[in-house]
Amino acid sequence: MAAAPPLAAGLRPAMAAAQAPVVAAAWGVGARRGAALSSSARCRALRLSRGGGGGRDGWVPPPVVGRMPPRTLSVRCAASNGRITQQEFTEMAWQSIVSSPEVAKESKHQIVETEHLMKSLLEQRNGLARRIFSKAGVDNTRLLDATEKFIQRQPKVLGEDPGSMLGRDLEALIQRARDFKKEYGDSFVSVEHLVLGFAEDKRFGRQLFKDFQITVQSLKTAIESIRGKQNVIDQDPEGKYEALDKYGKDLTAMARQGKLDPVIGRDDEIRRCIQILSRRTKNNPVLIGEPGVGKTAIAEGLAQRIVQGDVPQALTNRRLIALDMGALIAGAKYRGEFEDRLKAVLKEVTDSDGQTILFIDEIHTVVGAGATNGAMDAGNLLKPMLGRGELRCIGATTLDEYRKYIEKDPALERRFQQVYVDQPSVEDTISILRGLRERYELHHGVRISDSALVAAALLSDRYISGRFLPDKAIDLVDESAAKLKMEITSKPTALDEIDRAVIKLEMERLSLTNDTDKASRDRLSRIEAELSLLKEKQKDLTEQWEREKSVMTKIQSIKEEIDRVNVEIQQAEREYDLNRAAELKYGSLNALQRQLQTTEKELDEYQSSGKSMLREEVTQDDIAEIVSRWTGIPVSKLKQSDREKLLYLEEELHKRVVGQDPAVKAVSEAIQRSRAGLSDPNRPIASFMFMGPTGVGKTELAKALAAFMFNTEEAVVRIDMSEYMEKHSVSRLIGAPPGYVGYEEGGQLTEAVRRRPYSIILFDEIEKAHGDVFNVFLQILDDGRVTDSQGRKVSFTNSIIIMTSNVGSQFILNMDEEGGSTDSAYENIKKRVMDAARSVFRPEFMNRIDEYIVFKPLEREQINSIVKLQLARVQKRIADRKIKLEVSPGAVEFLGSLGYDPNYGARPVKRVIQQYVENELAKGILRGDFKDEDSILVDTQVTVPSNGQLPQQKLVFHKMSEESAPAAAEDEKFLPAV
């Protein structure tokens, strides 16, 4: 038997090695941070087996004659490069190395090789390797698939601990990565060094790069574009690469792609920004204005001008990057991590040699950002660069936040130059809306009429307070278009009703199918005939709806194509590719526009025929409806002409307010003057003082006015001035001052008007309030606004202010002694009442009220009318039980005589009806005398006492039969309560 050939020098069989301490410990993801990778990192493993199972790394001994084939032997040797430790790698590179054994284990491989490292690198989320390959023009998904296919082709090991040994090729790759680290002058081995190491990997990397046409030069170019001029000086450099791309948004790139909305107007503000940016130092404008006036739009307008070349030489071909402070702060777990990110951003900006301009929206968030546990905040990091002119930065913030944050830091404030952005006028807003119309039409797939744009600007300015143009007008147009789009895509009402009817008849037909009687068969035949008609109509309507929808969809797709062609034309003109621009403009664009005109004409003809089920144009009625939903104003008030509605105001008020003709007339005329546009738009709609004795209808007139103007009595904000008798109680109206309890809650008056700006404000018993309370009313009545305790301006320009007072009521009650109720007597009494008011209220307060209205005391006949009104309310309360109340004229007269008291007005009537009518009705219902759907007659009855006293009159309640009820209602003797 021949002797076995000797093993290669320096190698020991695994059986012999088993006698010595094992040095190849398993290593994997669970390796301790900071510790050596494992002892096996100092060794490389060779698998010796017959048949070439070890691949390139295996050494196959020659066959031995007359002996059994040798078993597979694991042979180890010491690596010459020492230990692999975490300290020499960046965190991302170390993570990929540590997770490689796990990849090998999943694939049932004992030796960790370069292909496992490649898969680990490509599977890192937001990993640097993926970014490098993407920059080099390689599809990462295809690269990962090729790697996995190579791994699957490798032989698998069963029964042993897989993934426990470091392969020779992987060790060589790590050594090459160390060499690239020295070449780049870095302090740590990073992911890019590992990626470059694959280029010389004979096992796997070289062939992979050849298949995907990846060269070392293309990789180095990609790495340089990502790294810039940075060196790896810490263990997290990957987070600082492309910091601007990661934490910012390139507005100039978006402008080139046509993704920014057009900016209309604002030329002065943009020119001022350009002027400040062109300075040598402190070249940092900050845009200050109210929220919604268009500060961010100015930065976008500047980006568009840079792209178009409409800027001075100092700003030509510059990049405008919008910094995302949220992304910058998010995920910064460790102390100093946020500062590292911000420094990386600032370094990229300064390294660009003025080619990059930073835009920080909501710049007040920079002050104090990241300043936790003694760390330096972002504002202090910006200051040196801002002052020296190394960093050009545009900021944007609101007036309040600028004062609260920026002005508190004078060193930061002086580095910024203020550019105030005012709210545009209504005319400018209409121009802005016209410029944006095409974008919103394209997005929603509807048309927006010019009248809708004008209505959006006018109605938002008039009715939506607390927000600013053009933002609130744009929101109106956007929401109206979205509502119309939703209606187009939803099933039309006519079709939906037919669908429901078909389902109902189908269910009825199924239930009648098994019935054999003649009536059921007749009903079944009628249902089938009706179903056939309905289904035919359903089919026609569905086809019509689908046809209209398809035409609208086609129009939208043509518009999108036109928009894309326009962007391409602009890009071609910027690149001076005039042939391409002319070809697009006079070829593709013309063809698309002709196609659009033809399709729109087809749709218009169809809609004008009256058969259309869909509406595809936003009108001013749609805008008005959205305004009503935002503010609570009834939509009919805006859509219906005020002239038509207000002409009947006096008649409507008289349905609820009995008598008081001068008061009702004065209120109606004041409202008509206001709505006709003859009153001051900077003052309340109207302000009245109702003076008169108690119970004559002062508060009722206010409620009736609210029900007519706003369709609900809830629109009355009632404030009882007897609660404001102390001097300090004025703070309850407009809010407590800072430092006092209730400061955050706001005032009772100001909060009510802010929540519901269109209401009637009723100050009841005004003379009972403290004199200092009237000082608040001066600016409300004169300027239509008041500033609350938190500095917010509350507008009263759309409110009706009514004050009631009992001053001089003694003169009104003595009116009969003065000569009855003639006009001359009324004027005389009114003069006396006004004199009494002047003795109570100060002249500057009285001079601001639009009209003083003196209420007359109620007469006996008017009390009867009030009795009928109160009985109608009783009938309303029992209407849900379907009980009808019939009241005779005698009963009305009886109740009126009991409720008449000149000193107390109409209030006793309510008590009388409660005592004589409601109580008796309640007892009758509880006894069972009156049941649901009964008709009850209320009449009077005279009783003669037997003791010789005078006859007495009382109310009696009779249950009427079904036959007598209609006759009694028609008889003149009886009056229905309603």
Swiss-Prot record:
Localization per Swiss-Prot or TrEMBL: Plastid, Chloroplast
Annotated stretches, region: I: 244-492
One Pfam family cited in the UniProt record for this chain: ClpB_D2-small
GO biological process, one term: protein refolding
Gene Ontology CC, one term: cytoplasm
Transit peptide extent on chain: 1-76
Segments for region (Repeat 2): 166-229
Induction: By heat and oxidative stresses.
Region (II): 618-809
UniProtKB keywords: ATP-binding, Chaperone, Chloroplast, Nucleotide-binding, Plastid, Repeat, Transit peptide
Gene Ontology MF, one: ATP binding
Family: Belongs to the ClpA/ClpB family.
SMART domains for the chain: AAA, ClpB_D2-small
Top-level lineage group: Eukaryota
Name of the protein in its database record: Chaperone protein ClpB2, chloroplastic
Keyword Ribosomal protein: no
Region annotated Repeat 1, chain positions: 89-154
Cleavable signal peptide: none
Residues binding ATP: 289-296, 692-699
Biological role stated in the UniProt entry: Molecular chaperone that may play a role in chloroplast development.
